[in-house]
């Protein structure tokens, strides 16, 4: 577990360093210094978004993600995650239940999404987050069907990060589609 956590932290730091290089090329300096002063271990794009706001580069977190840190953002850098079997084994070794979080946010087409969920199930994954903030009901239904096809639990989540975020409040989410609600986990 410690090795996986250390690798995840290293990957987050490398991603921040890549974003920092892009910012420097645009004349914006100080990101790494800012991040090193924060009282956290897991650097995230939320921290970088706050740096962009503080520096007058972005107007809001929404603007920071849409224009600079999202998939097509000006300063974006790819995330580096561990392999699915490693993630599943680590979660289960710690006594957790391995749930694939918000899969419709990974910018995958239906074929790749189906493949991801199938691979996750084959690696011992136990569930998929089907209902989460602002997900289209048709996509929720599709996610529920993929859970059933792969014998996975259907999970829900609000994707709550902080009261300042506007997309959803803690504990608020849409109900699971009826066809997958019999095999649900919270």
Range-by-range predicted roles:
Residues 7, 19-22, 26, 51, ...:
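Residues that form generic nucleotide/phosphate-binding pockets
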Residues 1, 5-8, 59, 82, ...:
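Charged catalytic cores and adjacent phosphate/nucleic-acid-binding surfaces used
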């Amino acid at each position: 577990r410690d090795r996986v956590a250390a690798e995840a932290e290293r990957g987050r730091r490398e991603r921040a360093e890549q974003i920092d290089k892009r910012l420097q090329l645009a004349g914006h300096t100080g990101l790494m210094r800012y991040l090193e002063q924060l009282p956290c271990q897991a650097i995230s794009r939320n921290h970088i978004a706050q740096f962009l706001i503080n520096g007058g580069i972005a107007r809001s977190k929404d603007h920071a993600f849409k224009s600079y840190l999202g998939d097509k953002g000006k300063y974006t850098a790819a995330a580096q995650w561990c392999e699915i079997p490693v993630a599943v084994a680590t979660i289960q070794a710690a006594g957790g239940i391995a749930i694939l979080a918000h899969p419709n946010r990974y910018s995958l087409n239906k074929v790749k999404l189906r493949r991801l969920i199938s691979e996750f199930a084959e690696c011992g994954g136990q569930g998929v987050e089907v209902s989460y903030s602002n997900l289209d009901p048709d996509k929720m239904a599709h996610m529920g069907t993929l859970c059933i096809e792969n014998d996975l639990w259907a999970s829900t989540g609000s994707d709550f990060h902080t009261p300042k975020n506007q997309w959803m409040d803690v504990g608020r989410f849409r109900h699971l589609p009826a066809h997958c609600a019999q095999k649900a986990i919270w």
